[in-house]
Amino acid sequence: MQVKEVMTSNIAALAPNNTILDAAKSMQAHNIGCMPVCNPDGKVAGILTDRDIVVRSLANNGDPKTTLVKDVMTKNVITAQPDMDISTALELLATNKIRRLPVVKNDTLVGILAIGDLATRHIFLNDAGQALSEISEPSRPANMTQ
C-alpha cells in the first residue's frame, strides 16, 4: 500500500509570515493541532504544532499578534512522497520520532500522513502502534509542585 492511498489531501497550510494568532485560529477552525507551512510556491518550509506555539512563543512571552510562524515552526521537515510504501513511511515516523509527514510531489505539498490516519483505518495497526510507542516518551514535568 502507498502513502497516497492513506494520506489526507486538500489540507490547509500556513504561510511563514502568518502570525501565530492566525495559526491558532486556523488550527481551531480546522480542529487540528498541526499544520504544514508553505512558501507561496507550495514548497514546504516547515511544520507548526500547537505545542510549538505554546513552548516556543507564549511561554517565552511572545506576542501572538506579532510573532511570526516562521520564527517558531520546525524547519528542515522530513517528508514523504505519494508513491512511497506505507512501511517506509512508518519507518520514517519511528526513526525520526515524529507523528506526521507532509507529503510532497515535485517539492509541492499534496497531503499529510499522520500516524493516527493509519491506526484509525486499521492499516498496519501493529506497525503503527509500534511506531507510536517508539516516538512517544513518558512526559516528566520539570519542577512541578503540588
Language model features: what each stretch is:
Residues M1-N10, T49-T79, D85-A94, A114-Q146:
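Tandem CBS (Bateman) regulatory domains
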Residues A13-N31, C38, A80-K97, V104:
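The conserved cystathionine-beta-synthase
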Residues T8, A12-P36, V44, L48-T49, ...:
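N-terminal first-folded block
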Residues M27-H30, M35-R51, L93, L101-G116:
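A glycine-centered beta-loop-beta connector
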